[in-house]
Amino acid sequence: AAELDESSGSSGTPYTWVRGEEELHEIHLTMAILARHLIDDGSGTSRPVVTLNGFSMGAWATGTNVTAALKRLGVVKSTGPDADKMLSAMALLGTEPVFVIAGYPPFLRRLLDAAREQQFDLSRYTMYGVVGGEGMSEALRNRLERTFASVYSAYGASDLDIGVAAETALSIEVRRLAAAHPELAVALFGTTTRLPMVFQYDPSDYYVETIDHELVVTVTRPALVSPRIRYNVHDAGGTLEYADVITACRALGLDPIAAAFARHPFRPFELPFLYVHGRADSTISFMGANIYPEDVEQALGECADSDVLGAFALALIEIDGRDGTCDAVRPCVHIEVLDPSRVGDGELSARLAGVVRDRLLGNSADFRSAVAEDLAAADIRVALHLEGAGPFVGNATRIKRRYIV
């Protein structure tokens, strides 16, 4: 028996991969064991587990395989990315189960917004988030964890496996320490400009190389119908040995193991780390400085207006000079506004532009240098749009968000 999976097609035409029954069994079992571990709060109590799968369903690998894997935890309902349907399922099933909510990171945010609009009291429920498909800022995680007990991300690709690596309590704390201590970020990732997602992986299943700052993965499990040998999905990142990460932290007086234990009361996995900045080409460049979606997401997620903001996308736009001709380009952040009355709010646009600019000045040496050489580099533009309008047309049917337009 075999299964045909499609990639999302986010970079062009979807590609079809063949997976055999034994291969799928190994993937699903590993995912289920890890998920069970991550939702174990150490209390020793046993409650039924219900997984609500908000990933896109169909021929794509993630949605169908999450359903197949997490059936091993208990009941699964595959709603797809439909917040209303998911809330209806929660109302029907009540507050006794532990809910595992799976989906892309923006969907979990949308679920909270829908609950607020419907006055649906999520505080009565115990929920864990399992996300993947794209990066997640710590600002978004912090926001989600006001409601969720914990939110963990997984790294993978339809072209490889959907569970190549996963966040653990330890990897999350390492990432947070790197965000708070630039010297640690430099020691681990070589830069403070772009905070990567940080995962741990099993080297007995995946041999990961770094070539030209991109991850190259070989799946080493023997039960493969479609071999993946030195496969490059063009994700920028690298790998780190467990001992090297702990040593780098302790050299700065930091103890990620203690912090991880406070988050999840179990001994950390002594597995190597894998860090991912995102797709290698996911950036816009302006006056020699790269502007990354991760920095913009962090800035918008931390700002006071985050409740009314939806998706965003980066672009370079032409601006008119005094004679009506285009005489320059500027970086522009297109932002969805969930409140239609705020779309024309000039004060909101200016405030958001300042938030993004301040984040870049504080986090990007390239951007600071560009501004020091020419103040025009600090001229960040913001364009506000109705939900689903402008560059966000089609977002409702797109599997993954598009961050560069």
What is the role of each PLM region?
Residues 2, 63-64, 138, 294:
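Residue-level marker for well-ordered alpha-helical positions
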Residues 2-3, 154:
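Short, charged amphipathic recognition helices of the HTH superfamily
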Residues 3-19:
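Conserved adenylation A10 loop of the ANL superfamily
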Residues 8-12, 36-40, 56:
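Generic short alpha-helical segment signal, independent of protein family or function
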Residues 20-37, 50-110:
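AMP-binding/adenylate-forming
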Residues 40, 44-48:
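Short helix-loop-beta connector
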Residues 75, 79-405:
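Active-site glycine/GP-rich loop and adjacent strand/helix microenvironment
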